[in-house]
Amino acid sequence: DKIKFVHMCFSTDPFMYKQPEISALSCKLVKILNKEGIKCTVLTKGILPARLAEYGINNEIGITLVSIDENFRRKWEPCAAPFADRIKALKNLHERGVKTWISMEPYPTPNIIKQDIREILDAVGFVDKIIFGRLNYNKLVSDYKGRVEYYNKLSEQVIKYCKSNGIDWYIKEGT
């Protein structure tokens, strides 16, 4: 059986912020896999190189984005690329024909950060797919009264937004 795709993600982030040697190696891997007819799906908190568009449009390239508030990023994702830079790089790839997606997880509760999910959705309204999921295994989330209803409401908002903008979506089980 032939490998259908390889998923490169943040557990060993293929495009670590401020790590050009990792980014270069990841680009080489994508290129090699694509030459063998293997699609790549990529997820990063780094900045996506523009040259990914040169490898073909069958790949699916995504970023993690759970906020657009830089104070939140500095506290919760201190080594990740600024949100605006992630979005800009992803949009560049999308405009060049690459399939793009957003992982909006782990999405925080209001006792962690008060924010309007519609602002985030509007910032990434160009993508082909949005994956949404709750923040798990966190005492602050567990302490938030009404968390189940909160995540249900947000899931409905994501679905409604995606339907009205022609975007595919996936809501993680248990959200």
Region roles according to the model:
Residues S155-T175:
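C-terminal accessory regions of radical SAM enzymes
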